[in-house]
Amino acid sequence: MIRRPPRSTPKPSSAASDVYKRQVSIKTPITFATNMTAKINNEVYLKREDLQPVFSFKSRGAYNKIISLTPAQKKKGVIAASAGNHAQGVAFACKKLKIPCLIVMPVTTPDIKVRSVKNFGAKIILEGDSFNQAVKAALKIAKTKKIEFIHPFDDQYTIAGQGTIGQEILETDEEYDAIFLPVGGGGLLAGVSAWIAQHTKKVKIYGVEVEDSACLLEAIKFDKRVRLREVGLFADGVAVEQIGKNNFDVIKECVDGVITCLLYTSPSPRDATLSRMPSSA
């Protein structure tokens, strides 16, 4: 893909910056990856989103979506479906905002993840054997209870919240040639690429997918969103069958390319990362 000036891309609203005030999210550091740089002979930097209170970037988008709701919607509470990071992001944001929170998690979710979400005060419902089944259950409950469903990636406010990462990257003194972002449903890639594209043409943006879960690559091939028949589950955090609609609209305009990779094909850079990063990174 060739990056063009975005026609209509989400801008992190002034509300997005409020995530720092309530400490739902923090401005994370960018660290020089010494071992990985030596391994591949290129300077590599890591955006340390593992240092967030919920150990991932998901709290940014979740909070930005939730604060966009009306007072009446907030009073009723929200519901989300997730087996991990999104669940924690929504639950933590709701705790800070004192909003009722209901999370639907697949029955296969490890107990440790269920407990971590409960610790933020969310009510848990175990339903379905997969993420998609949990989503269907959550949407049904949302309709019955007339409460807002917080989508993990396919939402303009969520996308804009994730885009604050791009804002932080450009605030540093370092000049970067390219930014590489993992792709699941596309929320992170859409948000960061939108911000970068609006503020500079010097930095290339690439999405990175595992080959057996490459829903974005397939969408680009056919110039429309494609639902994968099956996805690999080793990298379960990015195992998504179909790229988000709002996400794909932004990505087509703002991203320079997509890279797919095989698991363990080149273990050395991975080993170099693991030797310097905590397991949650």
Model-identified regions with their sequence ranges:
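PLP-dependent amino-acid enzyme catalytic core
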Residues: 17-266, 270
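Right-handed beta-helix
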Residues: 1-2
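Hydrophobic alpha-helical segments, chiefly the membrane-spanning helices
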Residues: 277-281
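Short, small-residue-biased leader/transition segments that mark boundaries at the very start
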Residues: 5-20, 267-271, 276
